[in-house]
């Protein structure tokens, strides 16, 4: 069972393994009160449970959270539903490797996910390609290593691995304080953008350091707005 907001690599994996996905709809925001009009909202716990109720033989539920725009699914509620149906919850947390640096539980592994993939290079200071796979059950480790041997390179980049270690060391040194300051700044900018009439992400759960602004209601495109910013330094 997968939400339609998944990454194309997951679709490719399903094709290679011959998996038959059951899609969970992710309706787009239709009103500014919901968020940026036209952007798909995260899958709801209710839609996931409806799919599980109809497909009780599902091997897993696959969710992307947070998405590219910073919108986050209710992972805690979805995890509770998945486990009630004896189904694994897999979370693509590519844009959320930093979420465990906040005092409130926000990382999928803190909220009940069974497997979770983080891209360390998106929001942490690591080289492109640095990633981590988290497992709630240590017994999954051998199967995960076998799968990685099939789909991964036999000549990994030691520079990437070193950058991952250095990024984690840096986050342990002052990551919590740095992320807290950044989240406060983003919160202030969201307020300024909203007061000026811009559409912003308004989902109940959202990435504290992601600032996504819609420009359609202002009569310009993101490209035009970007050029306007560049001209003003």
Question: Where on the chain are the PLM-derived regions?
Answer:
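Conserved PLP-enzyme active-site core in the AAT-like
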Residues: 1-202, 219
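Conserved C-terminal alpha-helix-loop-beta "cap" of PLP-dependent enzymes
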Residues: 188-233
């Amino acid at each position: 069972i997968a939400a339609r907001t998944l990454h194309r690599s997951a679709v490719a994996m399903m094709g290679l393994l011959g998996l038959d996905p059951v899609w969970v709809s992710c309706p787009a925001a239709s009103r500014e009160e919901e968020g940026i009009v036209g952007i798909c909202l995260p899958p709801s716990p209710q839609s996931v449970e409806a799919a599980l109720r109809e497909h009780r033989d599902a091997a897993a539920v696959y969710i992307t959270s947070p998405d590219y725009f910073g919108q986050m699914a209710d992972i805690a509620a979805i995890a509770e539903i998945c486990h009630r149906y004896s189904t694994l919850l897999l979370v693509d947390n590519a844009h959320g490797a930093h979420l465990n640096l906040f005092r409130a539980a926000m990382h999928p592994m803190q909220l009940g996910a069974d497997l979770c993939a983080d891209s360390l290079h998106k929001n942490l200071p690591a080289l492109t390609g640095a990633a981590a796979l988290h497992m709630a059950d240590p017994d999954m480790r051998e199967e995960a290593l076998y799968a990685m041997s099939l789909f991964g390179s036999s000549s990994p980049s030691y520079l990437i691995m070193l950058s991952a270690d250095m990024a984690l060391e840096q986050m342990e040194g002052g990551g919590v304080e740095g992320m807290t300051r950044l989240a406060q700044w983003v919160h202030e900018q969201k307020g300024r953008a909203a007061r000026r009439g811009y559409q912003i992400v308004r989902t109940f759960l959202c990435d504290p350091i992601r600032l996504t602004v819609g420009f359609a209601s202002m009569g310009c495109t993101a490209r035009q707005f970007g050029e306007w910013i560049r001209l003003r330094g």
